[in-house]
Amino acid sequence: MSLVEAKSIPVLPIPNRKVCARSIFGIDVDMEVPAFAERTQFVPDIDQAYVFDKVTTIAILAGFKHNRSVMIQGYHGTGKSTHIEQVAARLNWPTIRINLDGHISRLDLIGKDAIVIRDGKQVTEFCEGILPWAIQNPTALVFDEYDAGRPDLMFVIQRVMEAEGKLTLLDQKRVISRHSGFRLFSTTNTVGLGDSTGLYHGTQQINQGQMDRWHIVTTLNYLKHTTEIKIILSKEPYYDTEEGRESISNMVRVADLTRSGFITGDISTVMSPRTVLVWAQNARIFDDIGLAFQLSFLNRCDETERVIVAEYFQRCFNIDLKESASNLIMGR
């Protein structure tokens, strides 16, 4: 979304109804959450097959209901951002998602002078960035990869993190207050203390004064084996046969082994649920589950670790890949 587009967006309506968390999200909790009666262009699409994690869902709902800033930490591919979007989708809550990559600048967030056409003439005019617009509307602002944000951006964001936080536009001599329906979320791979695993190059240590402003910090781990199978089958109903379910179960077993191997330090690359889904899709494309595994995951792994990963595959499917130890010994 450009600065000029943000300036031209109309003011959004406010939450005008309440929904029951138990009936909407299927979790065992008594909570009524504010929501919108109608959808707008900013509301994420609903994924009917999405499976909600109870603790993470409660944390996000508390953020929406009680105006709490919520941070979700977890490994890649666990569905942190998607979880926020799917909660917001069922509340019809407008959601803006910003990835804090190295190219996002302070001017992108706050705004800058831009040339616009007024009465047929070019004039220089200040155009608000996405942050001033978002905090003046009932939106859920999601900062993806929050721990990869540049330090100068962190202090801009810090201004609006408190429940009654205000944003000062120095160039405009304006002070903007938070809309009562504005909500703030973030997703991170670390908890602000830097990356000790070596998996997440580019992440930063986060100022602890800022970490203290996140009211709720929750962790979203990888899914249970049976839950992950259920999700893959819902996304790829082609496999919903006896043979297909066995194949998906074995795929998830391989993923579980990579996660266990990562935890014990045997390998440095983890198979996420997203990768399992891609593997299942590629297996249909190539009609070869072993080739699909190589192209979807194995080729990403360090060469010194491919033997271990190939053994995970062999253990689950009883198929030897060329990288497996037995083939290397035989010189195949």
Question: Would you name each region that the model predicts?
Answer:
Residues 1-40, 50, 57, 224-225, ...:
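Alpha-helical lid/collar subdomain of P-loop NTPases
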